[in-house]
């Protein structure tokens, strides 16, 4: 009970409510405990697998496909007002679906039976440690894994030479969790290229107008595949290197050397025919969304290709 003097003959008494403070602390402790338990339960629920794919992947896929379905009814009106804005919204949804599919495929294939069960791994540890003790090696190898290299400093022979399957490192399957950062970056890339995609289609339709129809289509396809595709693919790898992966000039050079030419070759196997159909059949206001819709499969491949090591 502290006393505070304000002047002559004036005393103010403050009563400390210690019980209330303790109650508040207990309440906060209980609340924090329940919050942690709820978060853990939610994580467990979202990591539940349906057909080998987590509930998180399924939920996001359903939400984005439903949003795309509802968006289609408003596309014409949006395109009439602004072609860029309509393309922007379309790309965000389609690129989001592409990466969800890519991560779902990776999640599906990450779920398989370990070729070396844990009980065999533990047994191998036990036998190896006992042999080290008998040889006077003590327990220095307690921290070693069955998949470590047991080679001595001056020998090229390993105990695993007779068991090559033990040389494979134990994979840490991180593909069973959804990578929201990668997903967001992929949608941002779709958002970014919308500012170039819509004007590019307008340019092609405006520039090639006097020749017969088939000739116009071939000219547009060649212009698209020889100019737009190589540049946009290179820019995508730059974006993924610097933004998504935090790389530098050296990592970009390695990525381009390892992935660019082969990916561009795959592009030329798919997109010339797609764009020929696009420019020949589709109305002009549906050319961009048509290519983006077909691009769901391509972007899914591109996302997996970029994530490959």
Curated annotation (Swiss-Prot):
Principal localisation: membrane
Side Vacuolar, residues: 1-52, 103-183, 247-260
Localization per record: Vacuole membrane
Bilayer-spanning residue ranges: 53-73, 82-102, 184-204, 226-246, 261-281
PTMs per UniProt: N-glycosylated.
Topology versus the membrane: Multi-pass membrane protein
Signal peptide (from-to): none
Keyword set, alphabetical order: Glycoprotein, Membrane, Transmembrane, Transmembrane helix, Vacuole
Pfam family, one: Mpv17_PMP22
Residues bearing attached sugar chains per UniProt: 19, 121
GO cellular component: cytoplasm; fungal-type vacuole; mitochondrion; vacuolar membrane
Superkingdom of this protein's organism: Eukaryota
Membrane-side (Cytoplasmic) residue stretches: 74-81, 205-225, 282-309
Family: Belongs to the peroxisomal membrane protein PXMP2/4 family.
Protein name in UniProt: Vacuolar membrane protein YOR292C
Organism in which the protein naturally occurs: Saccharomyces cerevisiae (strain ATCC 204508 / S288c) (Baker's yeast)
